[in-house]
């Protein structure tokens, strides 16, 4: 379930291309891209909203929660090898970091959810404060670095196509660092 929350930006209904110019689609007249072009985007009704989920996709916060559940419980499985457990946990760590990064690119500094809160958590525990830009980037990069250790160098098996490996993790890490080095965040004291 950790992979299920990866954004689906390839379909007609979720494509950013529909808001770029006069593109038309034969299937749908009112895609989210068209609604954004018409000015129907708002804080209370976001299109392409990763915070609360959109289309047939759940919220990235749900994805982070599922990743944390897997990481916390993978070592309770009795019929897996230690290597398999470590590899699956590393994939979940990477996906958790990637979901934090996607939220960061949309909303700036975000609350960091490294562990799930218990259902008995108090109101004060639930109200997690927003992190700074540096804290967000440091957390994402450190989580990716932690995941890389137990990821395979490269997945070449046809049964494992699309699974996270070191090449994918390092490429996303470079994107995170490049994004953080942009003038929007690097040295911009007015913004954050």
For every predicted segment, state its role.
Residues 116, 127-130, 184-192:
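Acidic, serine/threonine/proline-rich low-complexity intrinsically disordered regions
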Residues 104-105, 111, 179-188:
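Short coil/turn linking the two alpha-helices of tandem helical-hairpin repeats
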Residues 113-121:
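Short, conserved phosphate-binding/catalytic loop or strand-edge motifs used
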Residues 18-25, 88:
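Acidic helix-start/capping segments at beta-turn-to-alpha-helix junctions
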Residues 1-18:
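Membrane-proximal, proline-rich intrinsically disordered regions
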Residues 170, 176-178, 192:
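Conserved catalytic breakage-reunion loop centered on the nucleophilic residue
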């Amino acid at each position: 379930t950790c992979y299920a929350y990866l954004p689906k930006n390839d379909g007609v209904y979720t494509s950013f291309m529909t808001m770029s110019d006069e593109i038309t689609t034969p299937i749908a007249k009112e895609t989210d891209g068209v609604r954004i072009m018409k000015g129907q985007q708002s804080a209370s009704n976001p299109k392409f909203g990763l915070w609360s989920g959109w289309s047939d996709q759940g919220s990235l916060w749900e994805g982070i929660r599922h990743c944390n559940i897997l990481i916390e419980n993978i070592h309770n499985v009795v019929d897996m090898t230690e290597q398999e457990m470590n590899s699956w946990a590393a994939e979940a760590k990477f996906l958790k970091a990637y979901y934090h990064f996607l939220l960061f690119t949309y909303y700036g500094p975000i609350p960091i959810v490294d562990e799930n809160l218990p259902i008995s958590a108090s109101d004060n525990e639930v109200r997690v404060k927003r992190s700074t830009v540096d804290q967000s980037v440091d957390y994402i990069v450190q989580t990716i670095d932690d995941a890389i250790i137990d990821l395979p160098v490269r997945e070449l098996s046809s049964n494992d196509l699309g699974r996270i490996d070191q090449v994918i993790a390092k490429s996303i890490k470079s994107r995170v660092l490049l994004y953080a080095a942009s003038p929007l965040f690097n040295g911009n004291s007015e913004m954050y």
